From Swiss-Prot:
Protein localization: Plastid, Chloroplast
Gene transcribed to yield this protein: PPD
Residues annotated to bind substrate: 638, 695, 824, 845-848
GO cellular component, one term: chloroplast
UniProt modified residues of type Phosphothreonine: 530
Pfam families for this protein: PEP-utilizers (PF00391), PEP-utilizers_C (PF02896), PPDK_N (PF01326)
Keyword tRNA-binding applies: no
Task performed by this protein: Formation of phosphoenolpyruvate, which is the primary acceptor of CO(2) in C4 and some Crassulacean acid metabolism plants.
Gene3D superfamilies xref list: 1.20.80.30, ATP-grasp fold, A domain, ATP-grasp fold, B domain, Phosphoenolpyruvate-binding domains, Phosphohistidine domain, Pyruvate Phosphate Dikinase, domain 2
Misc note: The reaction takes place in three steps, mediated by a phosphocarrier histidine residue located on the surface of the central domain. The two first partial reactions are catalyzed at an active site located on the N-terminal domain, and the third partial reaction is catalyzed at an active site located on the C-terminal domain. For catalytic turnover, the central domain swivels from the concave surface of the N-terminal domain to that of the C-terminal domain.
UniProt catalytic activity: pyruvate + phosphate + ATP = phosphoenolpyruvate + AMP + diphosphate + H(+)
Source species of the chain: Mesembryanthemum crystallinum (Common ice plant)
Protein name: Pyruvate, phosphate dikinase, chloroplastic
Transit peptide, start-end: 1-74
Amino acid sequence: MASAFKGILIRSPPDVCAETVAKVSQCNRAQLVKNSSTGFKNIFKLSEARKFHAPVASHLRSQAVMAPASDPTSTAIKRVFTFGKGRSEGNKGMKSLLGGKGANLAEMASIGLSVPPGLTISTEACQEYQEHGKQLSAGLWEEILEGLRVIEKDMGSYLGDPSKPLLLSVRSGAAISMPGMMDTVLNLGLNDDVVAGLAAKSGERFAYDSYRRFLDMFGNVVMGISHSSFEEKLEKLKQAKGVKLDTELTASDLKEVVEQYKNVYLEVKGEKFPADPERQLQLAIQAVFDSWDSPRAIKYRNINQITGLKGTAVNIQCMVFGNMGNTSGTGVLFTRNPSTGEKKLYGEFLINAQGEDVVAGIRTPEDLDTMRSCMPEAYKELVENCEILERHYKDMMDIEFTVQENRLWMLQCRSGKRTGKGAVKIAVDLVKEGIVDTYTAIKMVEPQHLDQLLHPQFEDPSAYKDRVIATGLPASPGAAVGQIIFSADEAESWQAQGKSVILVRNETSPEDVGGMHAAIGILTARGGMTSHAAVVAGGWGKCCVSGCSEIRVNDTDKVLLVGDKVISEGDWLSLNGSTGEVILGKVPLSPPALSGDLETFMSWADDIRVLKVMANADTPEDALAARNNGAEGIGLCRTEHMFFASDDRIKTVRKMIMAVTSEQRKVALDQLLPYQRSDFEGIFRAMDGLPVTIRLLDPPLHEFLPEGDVEQIVSELTLETGMAEDEIFSRIEKLSEVNPMLGFRGCRLGISYPELTEMQARAIFQAAVSMSNQGVKVFPEIMVPLVGTPQELGHQVSLIRNVAEKVFSETGSSLSYKVGTMIEIPRAALVADEIAMEAEFFSFGTNDLTQMTFGYSRDDVGKFLPVYLSKGILQSDPFEVLDQKGVGQLIKLATEKGRSARPSLKVGICGEHGGEPSSVAFFAEAGLDYVSCSPFRVPIARLAAAQVV
């Protein structure tokens, strides 16, 4: 210890005076060891060091001996990284270690931009802090003090020195931007002595205004004192002085504010404001680290599925001031317009202000052109810096800057947030300007950006926040404004009268599809992200908010109850399908903004991607919409949806269901055949030259029966079928199932009622031959649902091929076709090699496969899923985002086993996961040939598939 202490004296700067050396020599060795764990602060507090030459104080701090035993971590791993103009110990590629803010500050410094000198404490240091009892280790504190000495040397000013005061800003900065972390602390290092020195140099009003801001910020952010506690004191003083604005307070007034603010610490915390600048810095750093585990931060990470981060970094920089008169100012800007993508600086600027003044809205900011006229040199440098940063980062940048007495300082840069329209234009323009290639441009647009372009959006979401009455699940994106209606029939009737309606139901059923189609938006009290309402609405591109448990739907009285509000039929509601918000009244809408840039951008995505993108479509209209959105075929056509297209069809289906004998059933099926054939012809025509995959009847038969109690159902079926009531009772009893989704459905229907499969196959082949004879290129693919054994599929394939031969013989025409199956039962995935002997293609039905693998009912999962997500038991809704570890492994296994038996096997997926970006990436990496999703998600899937390459 003695030799180490001697080293301090040997390494002291040449201007260390003899008096200082003597003072240090008197230090008690034992006392030094005792206090070393707190960074030498009790021996040479900065308040004492001010008596000596400031460089000596800084030098002593940096060389203070730390007791190794008190630090369980090793300083071999660098944890503090400094930066300043033209030099940096970090770079933009170190975001995981330095956080986004720290990495970008280091990068700006290294390329020669004017960045206030500073240091970044790494995310690994935060991790160590959390793991070691939330204490700053002696070794880390020593590194911080060494970094602080570098800042002091750069600036020629010193923390705690009244004659040359150095003030600091302290900010958090995780690798991913996370609102909910700690707010900024500015002007750290001020106390009664330092503020007097600052006042002598820069004027009393500036100094004491900075001091009162610091007391407020530090108290709120670091000490946990409510901002209102300070604000109350300020407001009372302004009233007493007869002024309204902070800027009207005199220096004398501000001194009074400072004293009152210091009293707040005593009143609220029972302790004095910590005047020691080192202590202030320690507490601020600890507050940033502690904020990583704050409830708000944890909740934010859970909601946004942010995992795998070590913690937050801490950025400490010397303060620069925009509030030092009319040659100073502060601003924020985007290097291009974030809303439109226009290549023009877009931002705001305030003369004689600090950064928080822009954000707080105390003063109205001015356009950047103001800066051009009043600070031409600084503005010119700013424009040059913007061009440098865009070309360096190859992106549109969000920049914060300050001008202090005509000198420009760059405070922060990051990739700028942008709208969908802005994102596409910026990506296209950057390619045209030669800054990025098309591969890079494709990755600059998020799939959610396309959602904005393909659905109507609210013009200004911030304008309606006070009218949000409930929040459900954002089941289908976009926005809808309409009058509420409580029945599907009424929705169709009102829509026929030219009214915009929102269908409100407890939950929807297949029988509601007419009203759902007529409605501009759908709101349900029950159901999840893959409920009937969500799936159907998503397929049509309609706005839907599902599972809104805050509302109570009273169909009888035709009212919607939310808390103490009663909303009646015909009242106006607005829905935000992207956020799940339910808003009272009308909110202005913006139509979808399709443009030439979007077409250009999507053509690049198509050139790059390997995975094909098809669509789920059940009608000719759906098929045409899918094709217009770039679909390369139909991956799923659900024949059961055609049965609900008219009253005649559904009544005929019910006759088929009620039939007791195969002869009776065949009569009803013969009546259905023309309907099915006509629909298939329309779809084949719309998809001329592209494959169409048609799934045979899948849902349980009870779904086609009327809703209501048994007496109502029997009464209605008696009228429709002419059967006696006791016969209908008997038939309904036989159809009744305890668990219909695992019961009499899928291929089990076709095996039990072969005539059903034969009718559907005949309709498909007759339609295909008819269209082919009219010059339409037809590629039908028939898909057998819910297969679990090769024998089930073999039975159905034999029936289908026999019907094909009969139709070809009857018409004298033939064509190529495929027969395959849906893999949606876990057993089918495990024996996929055997099933592939009968199947020419596999299509994974990930909705049912997820349901059966997890053992979750899609219709009931909403009761516990929110709890699972909030507790971190699940990271995401498995019906929305593919479970890659479980369901995904079954898909991989089935694909490998299937192709081992049939190398030419075509493999795809037709569940709702086909339009979810991270799931699409998995399917591409797993070697699937295609994904199929709703028509309105086709562009998103096209982009996601390209981003994988």
